């Protein structure tokens, strides 16, 4: 029997997930949708030819008997409420980042999930499912280059929307590095610092771009993370682990190589969707399979969402202060100690 999934929020990412579940993945079907724009929800059902009910709000969708699990793909500030309600209904929930807009909100979700005694919440940090990052994780865990000492990484976008702010460089962009690097080295963050290099001529007047974030872990690893969201040339994700005995680097996306007219070239992708489309597929399939086979989710946890929130808060404070700021995490509950995302 297919897992019956309800979708809360039928915007761009909601439609992407509806499409992959309906047309690409196995073991699940969309049986319910809701959106603050009811016309948009109705149109989504028609566009994808879904045999799904349209509900007026998340309360009615979560109470529906034809819903086993939910995807929360609504506006970020609405995530916390929907996730808490899903937990209270005993339903597994996949939530796109952010899990909540504050660390306090994430902790409320953590506490609510722990009351159930089982893992119900998975956060949408899809990079853990990217084949390149999985290879990095395996190499680090196997100490192929010894202990990690430093990490150099970059998150570059060709351009961003006019409403993109300096703070968003951390809370919307760097948050992916914050999660995946913590997962790669399995070491909590100790402190963060933000440095502003010379401003690019391509940056909007209100935006400080690029930015460099220095993160130190409790185990002494130093991470420098470049954020450059107006690089123009493409969407470029880089990650290099410097170990005691060598260096390992995130592989480039596969592409044909061209030798022509005295030049050797390969393509650079221009958007994040193409760069991580396969990771999104594996991520949602894992959500489906874990529920059907184990009755619990196995991807990034609510605690991972909390770590990301506390770290981004510290980065925003560092943006404003210009100083090194502590990452003040609470002690990890025993409930989450045994949960790690399995390499895919």
Curated annotation (Swiss-Prot):
Family membership noted in the UniProt record: Belongs to the Gfo/Idh/MocA family.
Q: What class of enzyme is it?
A: oxidoreductase
What UniProt keywords apply to this chain's record, in alphabetical order?
NAD, Oxidoreductase
Q: Describe its assembly.
A: Homotetramer.
Cross-referenced PANTHER family: INOSITOL 2-DEHYDROGENASE, PTHR43593
Q: What's the catalysed reaction? A: myo-inositol + NAD(+) = scyllo-inosose + NADH + H(+); 1D-chiro-inositol + NAD(+) = scyllo-inosine + NADH + H(+)
The name on file for this protein is: Inositol 2-dehydrogenase/D-chiro-inositol 3-dehydrogenase
Ubl conjugation found in the keyword field: no
Q: List the EC numbers from the record.
A: 1.1.1.18, 1.1.1.369
Function, as annotated:
Involved in the oxidation of myo-inositol (MI) and D-chiro-inositol (DCI) to 2-keto-myo-inositol (2KMI or 2-inosose) and 1-keto-D-chiro-inositol (1KDCI), respectively.
Q: In which pathway does it act?
A: Polyol metabolism; myo-inositol degradation into acetyl-CoA; acetyl-CoA from myo-inositol: step 1/7
**Gene3D superfamilies recorded:** Dihydrodipicolinate Reductase, domain 2, NAD(P)-binding Rossmann-like Domain
Listed under GO biological process in this entry are: inositol catabolic process
Determine if Oxidoreductase is one of this entry's keywords: yes
* Source taxon at top rank: Bacteria
GO MF entries: inositol 2-dehydrogenase (NAD+) activity; nucleotide binding
